[in-house]
């Protein structure tokens, strides 16, 4: 059976991996997943990521901890295949009062809510991370 929501699966693997204090998590790779992992690394929520070039490419995310606690407090899917959530530039949410980030898919690619506001763009809200 095929996966209905690969992004939700990725976020769940990260959440479960940190709950179990794993060093890293592996999942099937896709361009959108790699773009999300890149943003998470830039924002400091994960330590690193790598794509293994094989017959079936695999994305490995190295999780990040601070004083034994997971850096990612919450990671939540917002827009999903059954209910897409789009927000304009003035409607983009501030996650945890600006302490977290919302990952937004815009016409210029994936970016954080802060970057989208600076660029004056709205888009599909993929997930919240705090």
UniProtKB/Swiss-Prot annotation:
Superkingdom classification of source: Bacteria
SUPFAM superfamilies in the cross-refs: Ribosomal protein S8
GO biological process: translation
GO MF term (any one): rRNA binding
Pfam name, any one: Ribosomal_S8
Family annotation (InterPro entries): Ribosomal_uS8 (IPR000630), Ribosomal_uS8_CS (IPR047863), Ribosomal_uS8_sf (IPR035987)
Record keywords, A-Z: Ribonucleoprotein, Ribosomal protein, RNA-binding, rRNA-binding
GO CC aspect terms: ribonucleoprotein complex; ribosome
Its biological purpose: One of the primary rRNA binding proteins, it binds directly to 16S rRNA central domain where it helps coordinate assembly of the platform of the 30S subunit.
Family named by the database record: Belongs to the universal ribosomal protein uS8 family.
Subunit structure: Part of the 30S ribosomal subunit. Contacts proteins S5 and S12.
PANTHER family for this protein: 40S RIBOSOMAL PROTEIN S15A
Protein name: Small ribosomal subunit protein uS8
Name of the coding gene: rpsH
